[in-house]
Design a protein with these regions (language model features):
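Mature extracytoplasmic or organellar-lumen-exposed domains after removal of signal/transit peptides
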Residues: 49, 128-131, 177, 256-261, ...
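Extended amphipathic alpha-helical interaction segments
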Residues: 108-223
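N-terminal Sec/ER secretory leader and immediately downstream segment
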Residues: 21-120, 124, 128, 262-265
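Sec-dependent signal peptide recognition
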Residues: 2-8
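Alpha-helix N-cap/N′ positions at the starts of helices
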Residues: 30, 105, 152-155, 195, ...
Length: 278
């Protein structure tokens, strides 16, 4: 549940504005495809899944999109006025808050179906979760420390250039310095993901998702290894320092591009929220 919802939020944040409406119009198809990578359902259960996805999307259109529109406009205003560390903390908190709200709404729809899974269906889910973990290990846990830090820097540069256009040499150097300083947390993140997966699968096996999964997905950070909490905190602080340096080095054109993009997002989200569901 956590991963596919965050994937949707990330896609909305990183997609080109012209693609927001197309992405949202196909979000139900994406969610169904993602869930069917874990759920082995057919017949009436498959029809029920489709109905529950439709209800979730109705909730999201009415409740989440207006907030996204408001916050995108607020972010544009903050950036236009000059980025501060407080602005970055605000943005992070807003993103996490939206994710938790959406996950709780998704659980309200999915839990009744999850509570009726058979032992065979649960074993299928366990196998798929194990495959996801192996994929994560291939993408994030292989290679030397130097290789992984360089790969992290390349990913960040690509994402920043989606927003800013081509980065200057000084901006790229700021990214490299961040990646050299900030702790590598992927092993800790992998262990934490496995902890959360184990807790959620235990609820599914016990047929208690309706009673308890909603609280679990909005408080997934409870029970984290203190070492992971400390590493995440240090990582976020270093990342924010890097973003402030990127902002300090930004050209007028780069800043205007991001502000305009955020305002286009806001307009797109408002239009989608106002449009009748198909």
């Amino acid at each position: 549940v956590k991963r596919w919802l965050l994937a949707i939020l990330a896609a909305a944040a990183l997609a080109g504005c012209s693609g927001v409406r197309m992405a949202y119009d196909n979000a139900d198809t994406f969610i169904r495809w993602r869930l069917l990578q874990f759920l082995d359902v057919n017949g009436e259960q498959a029809d029920e899944l489709d109905e529950r996805i439709t209800r979730f999307m109705g909730w999201h259109r009415a409740n989440a999109l207006p907030k996204y529109a408001r916050d995108a406009e607020d972010a544009a205003h903050r950036l236009e006025s000059g980025l501060s560390r407080e602005d970055l903390v605000w943005g992070y908190d807003i993103f996490i808050g939206h994710g938790r709200e959406a996950m709780r709404a998704a659980v309200d729809q999915l839990a009744p179906l999850l509570d009726r899974l058979t032992p065979e269906q649960i074993r299928h889910m366990e196998q798929r979760v194990a495959e996801e973990n192996r994929k994560f290990a291939r993408e994030y846990l292989r290679g030397s420390e130097r290789d992984r830090r360089e790969q992290r820097a390349r990913r960040i540069v690509e994402r920043l250039e989606d927003w800013l256009g081509n980065l200057s040499k000084a901006q790229i150097e700021a990214v490299k310095q961040f990646s050299a300083r900030a702790p590598l947390i992927d092993e800790l993140r992998d262990r934490d993901n496995r902890r959360i997966q184990g807790e959620i699968l235990a609820l599914i096996r016990a047929h208690e998702t309706w009673k308890r999964l909603g609280e679990k997905v909005v408080s997934w950070d409870k029970g984290r290894d203190p070492a992971y909490v400390a590493a995440r905190t240090a990582n976020v602080e270093e990342f924010n320092t890097m973003l402030l340096e990127i902002d300090r080095l930004a050209t007028r054109e780069q800043r205007a591009r991001v502000v305009a993009e955020l305002r286009r997002y806001s307009a797109e989200f408002r239009a989608l929220a106002a449009r009748p569901a198909s």
